[in-house]
Amino acid sequence: MPTHKKIIQDLTKEELAEKIKPAFRSKQIYDWIYHKYAASFEEMKNLPKAMREELDAEYTLAPLKTVTVQDSMDGSRKYLFELHDGHTVEAVLLLMRDKEYHEDGSVKHQERYTVCISSQVGCKVGCAFCLTAKGGFMRNLTAGEIVEQLRMIKKDNDIAANRRVNIVFMGMGEPLDNLEAVAKSVKIFAEEEGMAIAPHRQTISTSGLSSKIEKLGKMELGVNLAISLHAVDDELRQQLMPINKAYNIESIITAVKNFPVNDRKRVMFEYLVIKDVNDDISAAKKLLSLLDGIKAKVNLIYFNPYGGTEFKRPSEADMKKFQEYLTKRGLHCTIRESKGLDISAACGQLREQELEGEI
């Protein structure tokens, strides 16, 4: 799918308005892109034909091509997208079902969508437990390529423009290693005349690039921060996550303490639980001490096995013991329900696919 055209989704609303005159035309284009999910400029019939032709000559509306869609029994959907240069990335649509309990005893069921998107082709971090790392790093995604993942998923699932959607930058790649493009995509997602996904519905997950955490904080984007911690001492963390050699636990904790968090929010610490590696109560004790004084919540994640790994999934009993130790001592802690296991769409299972022979 070769192209040398610019990606129009790389432009913010303001940047598009600077290039397209008069102003109402840029608003029409923005509406076609993010509300009507246009696949081509030719569809934009309320634009003059000459303008449609000029746009088509300079820009593409289709920087990604859907290669495969896999459906999970739990309602999740995994997308494999091909980029213009032949590389591929994956994104996942998660259907979350919440229950609201009312005083009269009634229960209201609500469905909401969370989309897990990628920020890079591959990843440099090289975590021992992550399948994405096995393929190495290829390149960063542009803001438009990040944005297009969500746009295509919303269109494919007929998700209304005003439907509540949460975004998690937890797909392929280290988001803070591509901070400028990720930050720009956050702003594009939040545009009120576009997708209107407020920053507090967007979560950026990082392996702990402390200097970039500080930079992200200074940007004042208003996004949620999630730290992929996974170990409570530097020795084990460096075995699991080689990047710990450059960004150790102490530097991460310092950066988190300086990160701006509003009164109703907490920094999420993600802790991937691996059987007989980091799942005992002594680790829970150290974690409690480590997060003392931080507005934190802990998200325990089951390790999701894949072919060739030596790591094992922990038992449900051990997960609950770990959780109970923390919650009884005042630390907010949840166990993440694994989604998309049957289609390899769960945490740590995304990777770039070779288009011949693997799909």
UniProtKB/Swiss-Prot annotation:
It is found in: Cytoplasm. Specifically methylates position 2 of adenine 2503 in 23S rRNA and position 2 of adenine 37 in tRNAs. m2A2503 modification seems to play a crucial role in the proofreading step occurring at the peptidyl transferase center and thus would serve to optimize ribosomal fidelity. Disulfide bonds join C116-C347. It catalyses: adenosine(2503) in 23S rRNA + 2 reduced [2Fe-2S]-[ferredoxin] + 2 S-adenosyl-L-methionine = 2-methyladenosine(2503) in 23S rRNA + 5'-deoxyadenosine + L-methionine + 2 oxidized [2Fe-2S]-[ferredoxin] + S-adenosyl-L-homocysteine; adenosine(37) in tRNA + 2 reduced [2Fe-2S]-[ferredoxin] + 2 S-adenosyl-L-methionine = 2-methyladenosine(37) in tRNA + 5'-deoxyadenosine + L-methionine + 2 oxidized [2Fe-2S]-[ferredoxin] + S-adenosyl-L-homocysteine. The active site is at E90 (proton acceptor), C347 (s-methylcysteine intermediate). The gene is rlmN. CDD domains: Radical_SAM. One of its GO terms (cellular component) is cytoplasm. The lineage of its organism: Bacteria, Pseudomonadati, Campylobacterota, Epsilonproteobacteria, Campylobacterales. It comes from Sulfurovum sp. (strain NBC37-1). This is Dual-specificity RNA methyltransferase RlmN. [4Fe-4S] cluster binds at C123, C127, C130. It comes from the Bacteria. Belongs to the radical SAM superfamily. RlmN family. GO terms for biological process: rRNA base methylation; tRNA methylation. Binds 1 [4Fe-4S] cluster. The cluster is coordinated with 3 cysteines and an exchangeable S-adenosyl-L-methionine. Reaction proceeds by a ping-pong mechanism involving intermediate methylation of a conserved cysteine residue. InterPro entries: Aldolase_TIM, Elp3/MiaA/NifB-like_rSAM, Methyltransferase_A, RlmN_N, RNA_MTrfase_RlmN, rRNA_lsu_MTrfase_RlmN/Cfr, rSAM. GO terms for molecular function: 4 iron, 4 sulfur cluster binding; metal ion binding; rRNA (adenine(2503)-C2-)-methyltransferase activity; rRNA binding; tRNA (adenine(37)-C2)-methyltransferase activity; tRNA binding.
